[in-house]
Structures are given as structure tokens and as C-alpha cells.
């Protein structure tokens, strides 16, 4: 028996398809999302509707974004969901969530079992629309969730941690074993809730500067910031901000990265790389 076939659909490796089929896990996720009628609910990658059906049961209208044309067509003809669905058959990586929020007249509640092969770049795409998003609930590779929630001084802490926590309050919800999927992935999974900050705890003047600093620091994470960020900050400037130049990228807090970004935005012209 081909374990890549589920409900008559052959899971496509290039789309990173693993279909959720554990009812306890499904119920737990839907309970965490707690969808309500009248809310602008948006699902990324509905697949075979494991989450779409129980969420859709509670709603009058649901928007879904599905890249796989066969799955999009299948949803279109779904016996009870079909009439409730607005289906965008396209790549979520190119989707304009800001336009959709404007069209729906309220911030979006986004959820989904994200394809693990694009989960990190998709998170960065979504972060650029946090003004248009109320909250997000995602099934991700457990290692990615660990990175999202990690604090300084840990191996999991990296650029994704800093940028996610700059934009959102990040809350782990549930761990999910490979056996909850068909075909079972080779990794453990977890569900995470991301709630964009209503008021930024660490405002920055130019998020592009924060992005550049974190990229340069974590690309050379074993180096001290005296070396990895030496082209941007002198030892005197770092010391003046109360930041030890002998620290590595993983030792610096989100607040300190934001402090550095604001200094650079005020005192230097960001050179586009």
C-alpha cells in the first residue's frame, strides 16, 4: 500500500504535503483557534480539509489559499463546505494578506498546517502583514517552533526568533507526533500561536535595518559581534549602548537588537546589499 495516498489523493513531495488525520490533534487545534462567526478566518494549505471541515462548521464564510489545483478543485465541490469557501488557488508566498484584510474590513485570523519546506520564508512573508493580522495558528516542524519561541543564550535562538518576537507574542500550543499524519513526516511537529503586538514592545525606526543586523550577526553566529558587526558598529558605540562587544549573536536580546537597529537608522545610511 502506498502510504503517500490519503483519501484518494497522492501526497506531492514538491508541495511538502503531509495530511493530518488524528482526530484528537485536530480537535485540540480547532479548540486553540476557537473560530467565531463573523471573523475573517483564512486557512493556508487546507489540503484534504482536516482542519477546514471542523473550522468551517462553525463559520458562515471561510477563505482558503491552496496551491495544489487538484485539492482546490476538490474543495470547490465539497458537499457542505463548498458554498462557504472563497478559494484562492495560488502560492501563499505571493499572496497579499493586506489587500484581503482591507476587502474583508477587519484583521485576519490565519491558520494552517504549513508545508515544512516553505514554513520559514512564509513566516517572514506573513510578518510583513502583521498590521493586517489579528492572530496566527500554525502546525510547523517542532524545530521551527523551538526557534520561534527561543530566548537568548540557547542554540535554537536565531534570526527567526528575533524577528518573530519583534512582531509577535509567540506561544507554543501543542506537540504532534509523526503518527498523526499520512504520510508520516520524518520529524516531530508542533502547533504555535502568534499574536502581533498591539503596541510594539521594542519599536524600531526601520525594520530593514533590524533585518540586516540580525542577518549579518547570525550568519556568523560563532564570532563575537565585535567581528560579525564590526562593519556597522565600533567597540565604543556597542559599549556606549551597554552591549558587550565580546558577546556572540545568540547572547543578544531582542531589545538589544532593536536598540542597535535604531542607533544605525539614526546615525548611518543603510547601504542596500
Swiss-Prot record:
It holds the Pfam family RrnaAD. Its EC number is 2.1.1.182. S-adenosyl-L-methionine binds at residues 18, 20, 45, 66, 91, 113. It is found in: Cytoplasm. SUPFAM superfamilies: S-adenosyl-L-methionine-dependent methyltransferases. The keyword Cytoplasm applies. SMART domains: rADc. GO terms for cellular component: cytosol. Its main location: cytoplasm. Gene3D superfamilies: Ribosomal RNA adenine dimethylase-like, domain 2, Vaccinia Virus protein VP39. Specifically dimethylates two adjacent adenosines (A1518 and A1519) in the loop of a conserved hairpin near the 3'-end of 16S rRNA in the 30S particle. May play a critical role in biogenesis of 30S subunits. This is Ribosomal RNA small subunit methyltransferase A. It comes from Escherichia coli (strain SE11).
